[in-house]
Amino acid sequence: MAFAHFVLIHTICHGAWIWHKLKPLLEALGHKVTALDLAASGVDPRQIEEIGSFDEYSEPLLTFLEALPPGEKVILVGESCGGLNIAIAADKYCEKIAAAVFHNSVLPDTEHCPSYVVDKLMEVFPDWKDTTYFTYTKDGKEITGLKLGFTLLRENLYTLCGPEEYELAKMLTRKGSLFQNILAKRPFFTKEGYGSIKKIYVWTDQDEIFLPEFQLWQIENYKPDKVYKVEGGDHKLQLTKTKEIAEILQEVADTYN
């Protein structure tokens, strides 16, 4: 059994806390696990209005990878919109990434602008229910921010999670942004960087926000090296199918680490 260093990457409006069930399980198996708070997320003191792009939002991940000792490699695990953080990081530090796991996640490609998969998500799932939106200006650019609605959280993200998990999400989610208009003008992700890393895609057809239509489209659009389909669960597989995700990550470590 191989041991790996997993770096867990949360989605927008969330924080490292989303991994609280998976992290100790992986550590009990002997793995090293780092769960990061991205900019203006979790306990990071910045506010989203201070952040002007998905790249700036990814700064804690980039800083972490920069500081890794020479020769050390990690396995990135990104949930939901965390796939964009993976792509940004891989373009800068592909030599430090043994593999990347996309957990019910956006899967960017290298043939279209970085907003391409987000645009498709919005086409497939346009109604974010009671989510509230606002605009702010950073570096002369108008950015749309959002605060996830409690109905959306319960019905579409934490669909099968227990009441405690849902309460945690209501208490700890913060304002965030998809930076969709900024991503639309960002340079494409590169074949030499992001395109060169091993990609593992994990999904369930019971996801109520990343619908099967969207997930199957992503798999076809930018074929990953390996696909795992989890039976049951919801958008937050790390909470509803924790054991199954840990088993998949062990297999990833055995294969790619």
Curated annotation (Swiss-Prot):
Ranges for domain AB hydrolase-1: 5-241
Uses in biotechnology: This enzyme can be used as a biocatalyst for stereoselective synthesis of a wide array of (S)-cyanohydrins by addition of HCN to aldehydes or ketones. Optically active cyanohydrins are interesting intermediates for the synthesis of alpha-hydroxy acids, alpha-hydroxy ketones, or beta-ethanolamines, all of which are important building blocks in organic synthesis.
GO terms assigned for molecular function: aliphatic (S)-hydroxynitrile lyase activity; aromatic (S)-hydroxynitrile lyase activity; methyl indole-3-acetate esterase activity; methyl jasmonate esterase activity; methyl salicylate esterase activity
InterPro entries assigned to the protein according to its UniProt record, in alphabetical order: AB_hydrolase_1, AB_hydrolase_fold, MES/HNL
Site, Increases basicity of active site His: residue positions: 207
Keywords, ordered alphabetically: Lyase
Enzyme class: lyase
Reactions accelerated catalytically: a monosubstituted aliphatic (S)-hydroxynitrile = an aldehyde + hydrogen cyanide; a disubstituted aliphatic (S)-hydroxynitrile = a ketone + hydrogen cyanide; an aromatic (S)-hydroxynitrile = an aromatic aldehyde + hydrogen cyanide; 2-hydroxy-2-methylpropanenitrile = acetone + hydrogen cyanide
Origin: domain of life: Eukaryota
Gene3D superfamilies xref list: alpha/beta hydrolase (3.40.50.1820)
Active site positions, chain numbering: 80 (proton donor/acceptor), 235 (proton donor/acceptor)
Resulting phenotype, residue 80 to A: Loss of catalytic activity
Binding site for 2-hydroxy-2-methylpropanenitrile: 11, 80, 236
Post-translation changes: The N-terminus is blocked.
Record has Lyase as a keyword: yes
GO biological process entries: jasmonic acid metabolic process; salicylic acid metabolic process
EC number: 4.1.2.47
Binding locations of acetone: 11, 80
pH dependence per the UniProt record: Optimum pH is between 5.3 and 5.7.
Function: Involved in cyanogenesis, the release of HCN from cyanogenic glycosides in injured tissues; the release of toxic HCN is believed to play a central role in the defense mechanism of plants against herbivores and microbial attack. Decomposes a variety of cyanohydrins (alpha-hydroxynitriles) into HCN and the corresponding aldehydes or ketones; two natural substrates are 2-hydroxy-2-methylpropanenitrile (acetone cyanohydrin) and 2-hydroxy-2-methylbutanenitrile (2-butanone cyanohydrin), but in vitro can also act on mandelonitrile.
Subunit structure: Homodimer or homotetramer.
Database matches in PANTHER family: AB HYDROLASE-1 DOMAIN-CONTAINING PROTEIN (PTHR10992:SF1078), METHYLESTERASE FAMILY MEMBER (PTHR10992)
Family membership: Belongs to the AB hydrolase superfamily. Hydroxynitrile lyase family.
Designated name of the protein: (S)-hydroxynitrile lyase
Organism per entry: Hevea brasiliensis (Para rubber tree)
